[in-house]
């Protein structure tokens, strides 16, 4: 990669991203972190990363979390306020217990904008048989009542299905993939029968 980009303004650093301290902040971060399960993270490294997550986000993360979770939750130091962050990661965090910390971070610490989920047979990792998703968020305080775009299938720019879901509904949903699997979601009733009719019990036949 260094040879390919030689002669450009791109600076290549070969280092442990999670051990670096941000010496500069950027408007955008695009990442595809390594998919490494917790079994393969050294104990001392895991403890250090858990401490860093708690220190930077105020959130306790499970020791069962994969390495990509730490990447997402420790990335804000590299972003300017209002900066955008885009991640290609496994989608399992949306349903498993260790993903609670990641989902809390996305709803509480940043402004979650969009999650695109690839279909199960559309693998994005050549060396890992996992379903994938793209997560986009902004480094900003989330609005009190904002909406998140959920898309599935196809590409992020040309998905098969598009849904808009309120953040409050996400907070109440344990398994976010349920929001992809069911039919269109009606988050608020636009009208009820009572808006058009007077509803009352009719005459009960045989009541004599």
Residue ranges with predicted function:
Residues 1-207:
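Signature of N6-adenine DNA methyltransferases within the class I
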């Amino acid at each position: 990669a260094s040879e390919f980009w030689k002669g450009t303004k791109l600076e290549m650093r070969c280092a442990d991203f999670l051990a670096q301290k941000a010496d500069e902040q950027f408007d955008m971060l695009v990442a595809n972190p390594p998919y490494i399960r917790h079994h393969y993270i050294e104990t001392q490294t895991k403890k250090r990363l858990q401490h860093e997550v708690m220190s930077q986000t105020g959130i306790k993360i499970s020791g069962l979390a994969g390495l990509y979770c730490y990447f997402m939750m420790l990335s804000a130091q590299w972003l300017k306020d209002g900066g955008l962050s885009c991640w290609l990661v496994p989608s399992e965090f949306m349903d498993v217990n260790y993903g609670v910390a990641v989902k809390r971070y996305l709803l509480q610490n940043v402004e979650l904008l969009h999650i695109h989920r690839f279909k199960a047979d559309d693998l994005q990792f050549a060396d890992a048989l996992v379903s994938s998703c793209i997560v986009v968020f902004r480094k900003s305080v989330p609005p009190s009542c904002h909406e998140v775009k959920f898309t599935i299938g196809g590409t992020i720019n040309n998905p098969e299905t598009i849904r808009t879901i309120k953040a409050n509904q996400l907070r109440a949903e344990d398994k976010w993939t349920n929001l992809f699997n069911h039919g269109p979601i009606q988050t608020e009733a636009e009208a009820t029968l009572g808006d058009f009719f007077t509803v009352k019990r009719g005459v009960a036949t045989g009541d004599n």
